Amino acid sequence: MQITSGTTPTIVFLLVSSSDDKTALTGATPTVTISKAGGSFAAVTNAVSEISSGFYKVTLTALETGSTGALILLATATSCDPWRDIHQVV
């Protein structure tokens, strides 16, 4: 996904159970970290919320999308496979 620099996009992601790598994980408390333009990973500012059926969302801040280049997201939680995604900030 392409993200415009300085915007506040909402990122939606699915977490699955690490026990079978396919069952949607509900009731988790995910930690989301980002790497901006090749920098070190750091926690996102806003809280992550569960939508339903293993889907979660987090809204990035304008500061978090302020650097052009690769924006890597990593979501982890107890008993789930890590979720990773790469976006391009332009």
What do these predicted ranges mean?
Residues 1-90:
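Polar, enzyme-active/binding microenvironments
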